[in-house]
Amino acid sequence: MSSRLHSCIVNALTFSRVPLIFAFLVCAVLAQCRACVGLAVAAGVLMFCAAISDLYDGRLARKWKVVSTFGKLADPLMDKVFFIVSFPTLLWVIGAQGESPTHALVMLVFTVLYILRDQWVTFLRSVAAAYRADVGAMWLGKVRTALSFPAAAYIYAYLALHHLLPPACQGPLMASVYAVEGVLIALNVYSCAVYTRVYWPYLVRAIGAK
């Protein structure tokens, strides 16, 4: 295959996250409203496919040597679309189930922190870019993104299927979901602090500029 075709395949894989994650939203809402396990499974499969596309688009781009500036910009944008859709959907499902106000609160804090962190880091990078700083993704940001995909899938799997499990299993699984959310909340706060520290000199320069 030509490099042009390779590039088209990689870009299609990257952008496939948008229809997949919106299809997840629809299936997850319908599954909750209709109490349909089949729709819940379909929603889980759609989320998994959207998440796995993030793993393979970059891998194929490097394998086929079609890494591009467009791809480097599109990939994090598609990641943001995934999280902006998936986490509020999870929050809605928790609220619709009405079983745990505490879990809803934890998920609300997590979702708000996640979105605010992304906006803050984007702002810091924009300021630093004006001074020609290196604004590439840090390893911490990559780890956060890599962990967030399976975390979202795990949380949804619990929400969709926990009522089918024996009561003795539900407590430990709920604790594991809280643990996952707690780790990601801490990682978001830490990531925000690290990016702020790195780009702080450029922010100070921008504030003092006339």
Tell me what each language-model feature is.
Residues A28-Q32, V93-A96, A129, Y158-H162:
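Short helix-capping/hinge motifs at transmembrane helix termini and TM-loop junctions
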Residues A12, P19-L73, V85-V93, S100-Y114, ...:
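Membrane-embedded alpha-helical segments that form the functional core of polytopic membrane enzymes
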Residues S16-F24, P76-L90, R117-T122, R144-Y156:
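Core segments of transmembrane alpha-helices
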Residues I115-D134:
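Membrane-proximal helix-loop-helix units in multi-pass membrane proteins
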Residues D54-D57, D75, D79, D118, ...:
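Acidic side chains
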Residues M1-N11, F15-I21, G38-A51, A128, ...:
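C-terminal membrane-associated helical module and adjoining short loops/tails
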